[in-house]
């Protein structure tokens, strides 16, 4: 039985992600979430108006839970390595077919397309915001650092590596941080 209030919402979102992983987008339904969560459909619809919004909220909660793992290591390079390590764990926590399934569904479902775009564009979900803010405060990065570019490049490189089946090992993360991200953050520092 799912608890009440915020705990209930968090539990429903965890179940929704579980159903999405198990069934894929096309077979995902509010009924399946309600059944697995031992909750009423009314409880779910009171919080999320449709399945696209529920999926967005579940992905938001998933990302936010991993972002909580990023802590201050005391330096920009080590903060970036810690952030990339977290992104690796986040990527490995989901099946590699999840996002391609959602992207295919976005082609013919405008509601889902809008929800996923809002999820991906939410600056509050960027794991790079806190480390870059700390770096600016420590004088390791300029106030004009392009946070969105750093996020986009890091996730694109990670996604590319996952798609090709290449290793997401510490060596790759170190090269990505040293040869790409730090160069973008501090041009001319090499």
Curated annotation (Swiss-Prot):
Q: Which domain of life is it from?
A: Bacteria
Q: Name one Pfam family in it.
A: TetR_N
> Which residues, as ranges, make up the DNA-binding region of this protein?
29-48
UniProt keyword annotation of Transmembrane present = no
BP term (GO), one: response to antibiotic
Q: Name one GO molecular function term.
A: transcription cis-regulatory region binding
Record InterPro entries: DNA-bd_HTH_TetR-type_CS, Homeodomain-like_sf, HTH-type_TetR-like_transc_reg, HTH_TetR, Tet_transcr_reg_TetR-rel_C_sf, TetR_C
| Residues annotated as domain HTH tetR-type | 6-66
Triggers of expression: Expression strongly increases after 30 minutes and then decreases over 3 hours in the presence of tetracycline; not under control of whiB7. Probably part of the TetR-TetX operon.
**Its biological function?**
Binds to its own palindromic promoter and represses transcription of its operon; addition of tetracycline or doxycycline (but not tigecycline) interferes with DNA binding. Addition of TetX to the DNA-TetR-antibiotic complex restores DNA binding.
Q: How does it assemble?
A: Homodimer.
Query: Can you say what this protein is called?
Result: DNA-binding transcriptional repressor TetR
Q: Which organism is it from?
A: Mycobacteroides abscessus (strain ATCC 19977 / DSM 44196 / CCUG 20993 / CIP 104536 / JCM 13569 / NCTC 13031 / TMC 1543 / L948)
């Amino acid at each position: 039985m799912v608890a009440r209030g915020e705990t209930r919402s968090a539990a429903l979102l965890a179940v929704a992600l579980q159903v999405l992983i198990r069934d894929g987008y096309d077979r995902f339904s509010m009924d399946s979430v309600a059944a697995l969560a031992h909750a009423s459909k009314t409880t779910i619809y009171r919080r999320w108006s449709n399945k696209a919004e529920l999926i967005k909220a579940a992905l938001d909660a998933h990302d936010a839970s991993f972002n909580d793992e990023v802590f201050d290591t005391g330096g920009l390079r080590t903060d970036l390595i810690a952030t990339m390590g977290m992104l690796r764990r986040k990527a490995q926590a989901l099946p590699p077919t999840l996002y391609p399934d959602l992207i295919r569904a976005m082609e013919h479902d405008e509601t889902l397309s809008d929800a996923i775009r809002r999820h991906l564009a939410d600056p509050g979900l960027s794991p790079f915001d806190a480390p870059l803010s700390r770096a600016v405060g420590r004088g390791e990065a300029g106030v004009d650092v392009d946070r969105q570019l750093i996020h986009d490049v890091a996730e694109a490189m990670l996604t590319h590596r996952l798609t090709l089946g290449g290793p997401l090992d510490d060596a790759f993360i170190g090269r990505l941080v040293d040869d790409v991200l730090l160069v973008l953050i501090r041009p001319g520092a090499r």
